[in-house]
Amino acid sequence: MSNNEQSAILLINNFLNKIRKSGFHTSKPIKAQYNFQAGIKGLDGSIKLLVYFSKKGNKVLLQGNKELQLYQQVYSLIFGERLFSSVDSKISEPMNYIGTDESGKGDYFGPLVIAAVFTDASFTNKLKEIGVRDSKELSDQSISLIADKIKKLEGCIFNVIAISPEKYNILYDKMGNLNRLLGWAHAKAIENVLNLKPASEAISDKFGNEKYIYSSLQEKGKEIKLHQVTKAEKFTAVAAASILARDSFIKWFHRVNKQMNLQLPKGASQKVEEKAKYIKNQLGADVLKKLAKLHFKTTKKL
């Protein structure tokens, strides 16, 4: 192994250790023709870290969807700066606002779920008292328990939109862009909450240009101030929305696995690809389109 190869493997292992300490799953680095590479998985998808070796030295590259929260967090860990900066990233929690979040956008199987929750100063305290925090810090069992508590809180105003894979595929074909679909769904959830309770602000996690949400908002929605920020789950209403969305997503898997006697894996891993091949070959393409988001690269491998 050359000196450049040795420095490259040392470099990628150092990065992977740092990434794992932040709670992400990583694969073991493998050697390709000109680089060492490893996969990184998060809740909203997967990306790849590559460290190239040549006579000129080493080059680090992060490969994947730049709009994924996973990509932005890992980019920050490696390069020490945020890929996207936003004046809204330092906003304080408003007195009353709507928080939105989604679950399932990085998973081949399952629905895309978007939830919106209204809160004010007093209700924020109630949400915190029942354990509301970022759903990524909670087990599936805890998510189910806290989601139930959120729904039972007196005066809780929320909306959950679960887009089944079959409906998702129709909408994606129509819109041709995941961010447009996300924008439409977030806007719909915000509008549904506004029909029950007026609010002047809304906060969502940053997944793309604000225009994707604004362009889909109706009359009431266009009057609010929208903040799209990274790590938006630090805001209580967004954290509550993330729990409701994740709970709906998990329940879909429990229901479908029981009804169809399938153990559908989450994410977009090799296991997912193997299960998708089984479904297509044994149950048919019509069944697959009712269970999976077909625009994923996984479909092309089947």
Identify the meaning behind each predicted range:
Residues 1-98, 102-302:
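RNase H-like, Mg2+-dependent phosphodiesterase core
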